[in-house]
Amino acid sequence: MSIEHTSHDPSKPDPAKARTLAAALPWLKRYHGKIVVVKYGGNAMTDETLKRAFAEDIAFLRFAGFKPVVVHGGGPQISTMLDRLGIRSEFRGGLRVTTPEAMDVVRMVLVGQVQRELVGLINEHGPLAVGCSGEDAGLFTAEPANTVIDGEEVDLGLVGEVARVRPESVLDLIEAGRIPVVSSVAPDADGQVHNVNADSAAAALAVALGAEKLLVLTDVEGLYLDWPSSDDVIGEISPEALEEILPTLASGMVPKMGACLQAVRNGVPRATVVDGREPHAVLLELFTNEGVGTQVLPGVETKTRKARDTQS
C-alpha cells in the first residue's frame, strides 16, 4: 500500500500571530466583564468596509468577555434623507435648525435606518444586538441645548442634551448577554422628542452605567497639539490639560473631546477619541499599547506622537 504525498505543504504555525494574541492578555484582563461604551459615527457609518469592520469589532468584544454598548448619531444619513424629501434645512451659525418636520425625519433615519443596519451587521455574528433609543423605558430625558455662537445664544429648535439617564433597561440587556445599540433621540419632560448630541449622550450613558471606558469614533487621527501649525498628535492628556485647551479646539472636535472630558470628570476611568477611518479601530485602541487616538486619563503628562501621514 502506497501513501500519496501532495506537493502542497501544510501551513506552518505563525509565531507572530501568537505574540499578537499574547500581547492582548493585559487588556483582556483589564476589560473582562467590564462595560465599554462606543460612540459610532463618522466615516465608519458611511464606508461599507468600515461598517462591517466595526460590527466585527463589537461582536469580538462581546465574545471576548467585554460588555459593549453602542450609541450612534447619523448626520450624513439625516442630511441625505432631508434632501431626498425636499425638506429645506435652515442653518444658524453653521448649525442645522431641527424643526418639527425635520425631527420626524431624524427619528425615522436614526431609529429606522441607521440603528437597524448596525443591529443587522452585528447580528451576522450571532443573536447579539438589540436596538433601542433614548425614548425607550425612559432611558434619556432631554432638555433644549444651550448653544452659543460668537457670544450669542442660538435657538436650534428641537436639538437637545441629555439631562437625565435611567440606565436600568440597558443594564437589563447587558445582563441578558445582549449588545444595546442606542439611537440618540430623547423626549423632554413634556414628551417632545429632541435630536440629542450623540457624543454627549454616549458620555452620559457611560457615566450612568459605570463604564470602564468610553470610545468616540471620529474622522481624524486624534487631537492635534497645535493644528494646523503642528503635525503632533496628542496620545494622552489629563482632564485638567484638556479643559484648558478645549475653548481653542476646532469646532468639530469640541463635542467629542468635551464628551471625553465629561465622562472622565464624572467617574469613567478613561475616554478616547478614536480614528474611525482605520479598519478595526476599536480593537486597535483596546488591545494595543499605541492605540489609534487621543486618550483622556487622569494623572498623566501630555504625550504626543507624529501623525502617521507624516511619518516616512
Curated annotation (Swiss-Prot):
Entry protein name: Acetylglutamate kinase
A GO biological-process term: L-arginine biosynthetic process
Compartments (UniProt record): Cytoplasm
Superkingdom of the source species: Bacteria
One GO cellular component, as annotated: cytoplasm
Gene3D superfamilies tied to this protein: Acetylglutamate kinase-like
The protein's annotated pathway: Amino-acid biosynthesis; L-arginine biosynthesis; N(2)-acetyl-L-ornithine from L-glutamate: step 2/4
UniProt keyword Kinase, yes or no: yes
Top-level EC class: transferase
GO molecular function: acetylglutamate kinase activity; ATP binding
Gene that this sequence comes from: argB
